């Protein structure tokens, strides 16, 4: 009986990556595995964005516009509200070789260009320590890029810790960001 139920379910469900592509799951924003899986598919276009990716009721939304692979590819949406350019820079830098040579779409929102940048609490809601560590370990990323991103992360971590309702921040990440911003700090 269970085998029959599984067969019925599997025949009515779209393939995993096709069904997950239209959703902005936290695991795709703060993780790497699902992005790497999608990037490995020849018929998938990764779209990085912010809150505009959440308005799926609009006919021109990428998930609707390209539904059913009518343009010959599946879209995979990566982002949610407050995924500003810094979050995407970290995610793209952490992707290593998985995105090398791939076409991706990066939708930048107006809030990415405000002088004060992303608010510390919104940054922390989308920040991935794993992605940060992976980008630091990428020998192909320049020290200049690593230091710039580390400096920005260090600033945001300090500002976040000053918020009255801030959750605990991993002290190792704080020290690492400060050190990478200015490598001579701990030397």
Protein language model annotation of sequence segments:
Residues 1-187:
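Extracellular glycan-modifying ectodomains
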